[in-house]
Amino acid sequence: MASPDIFVEDYSAAVDFLGKQKFVDRERISAIGICGLGSHVLTAAAIDVRIKVVATSVMYDMSDSMWKGLNNTKTEEQRELEKDYLAKMRWQEVDEGPVGGPHELAFDENNKPIYWSKMFPDKLPADADPVTKQFFDYYVGRAFHPRSVNSNGAWDALTPWSYYNFPLQQRIETIKQPKLIVTGEKAHARYMAEEAYNRLKDPKELVIVPNATHVDLYDQMDKIPFDKFDEFFKENL
């Protein structure tokens, strides 16, 4: 199960823990969020000013992506269909216990919700879109783990529920701490990083990694701009 409140609180709880360590300077604690955690870390930093520096890499605004769809393609009709779907899933969980399902609901050619109980099939169809293939190659391939939800299971079917009610990044314009936003030139969610960057106030920096896709910046050591992250944190802490 994912929840915007829990994920945001995780960052503040991590600051709590670090701040209790004798070897940690409480005035030099920073945070970074990758993919969906990018929107959560900005949300956390807007209120928790103990986070002195914040960075994101290939950030995803999970609440926007769930509610509006990738590239804002979800229709009002689809949102109503999804509410009906979530209501059915909730009753099913009441009667039977937890039910696995997608954290972002897709629709078929007849505008019907597509339900599945596993994030990825064992084998992708030949006509799979490039973004799905990139995620598949990562989660089912080189980053596979038997206990990973994305590798070998599914999220709770009710995951979108809380994200619909409680959008992320509501106050990121108030973040005064230094901010670094990194994304890939070819990342399918690049626009989310750019939209967040445009809302942020100085000091801020946007880095677009040439030829990098979203998933490239998960683990491709030759594309992740480690030097930039290192420079940013050293200069601002």
Task: Give each language-model segment a name.
Residues M1-K22:
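Alpha/beta-hydrolase active-site loop
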Residues T43-Q134:
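Alpha/beta-hydrolase-fold enzymes
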Residues I175, I181-T183:
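Short beta-strand/loop motif that positions the catalytic acidic residue
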Residues P210-L237:
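Catalytic active-site module of serine/aspartate enzymes centered on a nucleophile-bearing elbow/loop
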Residues G69, A154-R171, Q177:
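Active-site nucleophile elbow and catalytic-triad environment of alpha/beta-hydrolase enzymes
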Residues K22-C35:
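Alpha/beta-hydrolase fold nucleophile elbow
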Residues E185-K204:
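Conserved loop-alpha-helix segment in the C-terminal half of the alpha/beta-hydrolase fold
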Residues L18, G38-V49, A196:
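Short glycine-enriched nucleophile-adjacent loop
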